[in-house]
């Protein structure tokens, strides 16, 4: 076991103290079927010595029964937990694993590569800071590679590590790696991700995963784990204060506090705040936590605020700074991932739940549907399981939100079926209908007609319909 594991076994309090101040990175592994996602995670855990002896013994036993490789020890079984996954050698569920290095703590989400499990991937990626896109060196950039990359971009992941896996299968050929790197960079011009890094690896053999590879001395960069340890994610934090009230704490007549997790920004005792939707203002009297009162609190902290004035605040309300208010609207546009077998019904009433706030609402129109394999937009009058589309929403009570690209915590929501209480969709807000209408490009009648003429007579030019941009 590693030093951390030894410390965990001998002095739990010291282990917790050491790890308390480490920053946390959540990352997702995704790629085509059988690209080696589970094997990669198994290799990270194995080579960083984060596996206990009893777990090792169980995996060695299971390897004899389910082994999908030629090795005596199947690393993918460290992650593939479902019986059907082990029998088929694939990942179906979203599997989470936890480990830590001297620099940082990690939560890994291993997601399915199959298209029919797109909703599982969306679930796993929704809270991640970084994505590892695995590409099989034998096949290069595939359709599923594009699909997973697009979904990561859609969900606001700002850091990508493209791991070209199974380099051992192509004799560690540098030319193969360079071609895949060039192909992906060309494709990635369509993505809204600025930080993309590349590393050639062999998860099965351990090359460039935790330790540097002796077989790829031509690669000048860092192994995968070193990249994960050094990529800076703290710059992604939004500095506008947002606190969604989860409940009002009233243990006695002398105390009234508003509990929730700080979604973004920072708050201090004495700061002026505004409650939404009432618009009432007050000042922070105290910030109470499990460890006692604090002078300030920041994103990610679970706190209870007490105020100097008695103002009306209840569950589902939002506390902000008066000069940094979010958008408030009953009409908004959002990218919607449909997550159930029954198709989306336009104008049907669903429960719209954003944080702790719930209201009734419906999709009043579908702007377009996105082919996640090609990223092309097309017309649609419904969305079915695993499809993604841009939709116009109308809700009964105004939502207080930021654009998802600016704040993932306050720009996301889920849709719940009123009859079954099942979660049927997940949405990422693009903005209010009014705001987006102001920024939409306006084309003259001549431009629209000319565009239609070009598309009709010169289809090989692949000109896009400007009315749908």
Curated annotation (Swiss-Prot):
GO terms for biological process: hydrogen sulfide biosynthetic process; sulfate assimilation. Residues 202-204 are annotated as: G5. Residues 89-93 are annotated as: G2. Residues 165-168 are annotated as: G4. Its EC number is 2.7.7.4. Disulfide bonds: none annotated. Residues 22-224 form the tr-type G domain. Residues 110-113 are annotated as: G3. Residues 31-38 are annotated as: G1. PROSITE patterns: G_TR_1 (PS00301), G_TR_2 (PS51722). GTP binds at residues 31-38, 110-114, 165-168. It comes from the Bacteria. GO terms for molecular function: ATP binding; GTP binding; GTPase activity; sulfate adenylyltransferase (ATP) activity. Pathway: Sulfur metabolism; hydrogen sulfide biosynthesis; sulfite from sulfate: step 1/3. Belongs to the TRAFAC class translation factor GTPase superfamily. Classic translation factor GTPase family. CysN/NodQ subfamily. With CysD forms the ATP sulfurylase (ATPS) that catalyzes the adenylation of sulfate producing adenosine 5'-phosphosulfate (APS) and diphosphate, the first enzymatic step in sulfur assimilation pathway. APS synthesis involves the formation of a high-energy phosphoric-sulfuric acid anhydride bond driven by GTP hydrolysis by CysN coupled to ATP hydrolysis by CysD. Heterodimer composed of CysD, the smaller subunit, and CysN. This is Sulfate adenylyltransferase subunit 1. It comes from Psychromonas ingrahamii (strain DSM 17664 / CCUG 51855 / 37). The gene is cysN.
């Amino acid at each position: 076991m590693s030093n951390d594991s030894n410390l965990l076994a001998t002095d739990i309090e010291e282990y917790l103290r050491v790890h308390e101040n480490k920053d946390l990175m959540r990352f997702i592994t995704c790629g085509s079927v059988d690209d080696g996602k589970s094997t990669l995670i198994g290799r990270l855990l194995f080579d960083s010595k984060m596996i206990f002896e009893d777990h090792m013994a169980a995996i060695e036993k299971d390897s004899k029964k389910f082994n999908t490789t030629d090795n005596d020890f199947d690393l993918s079984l460290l992650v593939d937990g479902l019986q059907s996954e082990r029998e088929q050698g694939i990942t179906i569920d979203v599997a989470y694993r936890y480990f830590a290095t001297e620099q940082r703590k990690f939560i890994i989400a291993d997601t399915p590569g199959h298209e029919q499990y797109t909703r599982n991937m969306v679930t796993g990626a929704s809270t991640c800071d970084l994505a590892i896109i695995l590409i099989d060196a034998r096949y290069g950039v595939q359709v599923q590679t594009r699909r997973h990359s697009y979904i990561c971009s859609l969900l606001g992941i700002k850091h990508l590590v493209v791991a070209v896996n199974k380099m051992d299968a192509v004799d560690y050929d540098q030319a193969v790696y360079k071609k895949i790197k060039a192909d992906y960079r060309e494709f990635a011009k369509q993505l809204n991700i600025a930080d993309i890094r590349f590393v050639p690896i062999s998860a099965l053999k351990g090359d460039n995963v935790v330790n540097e590879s002796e077989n790829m001395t031509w690669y000048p960069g860092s192994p995968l784990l070193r990249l994960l340890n050094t990529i800076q994610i703290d710059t992604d934090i939004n500095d506008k204060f947002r606190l969604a009230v989860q409940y009002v704490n009233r243990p006695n007549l002398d105390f009234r506090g508003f509990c929730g997790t700080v979604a973004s920004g920072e708050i201090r005792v004495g700061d002026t705040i505004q409650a939404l939707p009432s618009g009432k203002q007050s000042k922070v009297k105290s910030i109470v936590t499990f460890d006692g009162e604090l002078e300030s609190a920041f994103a990610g902290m679970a706190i209870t605020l007490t105020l100097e004035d008695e103002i009306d605040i209840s569950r589902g309300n939002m506390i902000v700074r008066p000069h940094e208010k979010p958008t408030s609207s009953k009409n908004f546009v959002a990218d919607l991932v449909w997550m159930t077998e029954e198709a989306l019904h336009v104008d049907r009433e669903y429960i719209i739940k954003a944080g702790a706030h719930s209201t009734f609402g419906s999709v009043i129109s579908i702007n377009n549907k996105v082919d996640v394999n090609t990223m092309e937009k097309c017309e649609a009058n419904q969305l079915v399981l695993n499809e993604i589309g841009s939709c116009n929403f109308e809700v009964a009570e105004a939502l207080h939100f930021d654009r998802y690209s600016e704040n993932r915590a306050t720009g996301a929501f889920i849709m719940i079926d009123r009859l079954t209480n099942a979660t049927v969709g997940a949405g990422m807000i693009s903005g209010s209908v009014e705001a987006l209408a102001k920024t939409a490009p306006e084309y003259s009648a001549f431009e629209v007609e000319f565009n239609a003429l070009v598309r009709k007579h010169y289809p090989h030019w692949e000109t896009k319909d400007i009315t749908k941009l």
